[in-house]
């Protein structure tokens, strides 16, 4: 199982509070919080999305 180290995270919009995207992350190589500008369908514009833990 090569992907056993990777964890699934959600990307939460900082303006609307919605979790719009999910992705995978290796916490050993990327220790800082993931932050990226992505499209928010509720607000219909690009906003900052930050990493949140998902319930398994």
UniProtKB/Swiss-Prot annotation:
Looking at the keywords, is Cell membrane present?
no
Q: Which GO terms describe its molecular function?
A: structural constituent of ribosome
Q: Name one GO biological process term.
A: translation
Asked whether the keyword Ribonucleoprotein is assigned, the reply is yes
Query: Would you name any one GO CC term?
Result: ribosome
What keywords does the record list, in alphabetical order?
Answer: Ribonucleoprotein, Ribosomal protein
Please give the superkingdom of this protein's source.
Answer: Bacteria
Query: What NCBIfam families does the database record attribute to this sequence?
Result: PRK00504.1, PRK00595.1, rpmG_bact
Family, similarity comment: Belongs to the bacterial ribosomal protein bL33 family.
**Protein name per UniProt:** Large ribosomal subunit protein bL33
Q: Per the UniProt entry, what species is this protein from, by scientific name?
A: Aliarcobacter butzleri (strain RM4018) (Arcobacter butzleri)
Query: What gene, per UniProt, encodes this protein?
Result: rpmG
């Amino acid at each position: 199982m090569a992907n056993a180290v990777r964890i699934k995270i959600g990307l939460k919009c900082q303006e609307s509070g919605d979790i719009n995207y999910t992705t995978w992350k290796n916490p050993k190589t990327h220790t800082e919080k993931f932050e990226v500008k992505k499209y928010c369908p509720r607000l219909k514009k690009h906003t900052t999305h930050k990493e949140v833990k998902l319930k398994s």
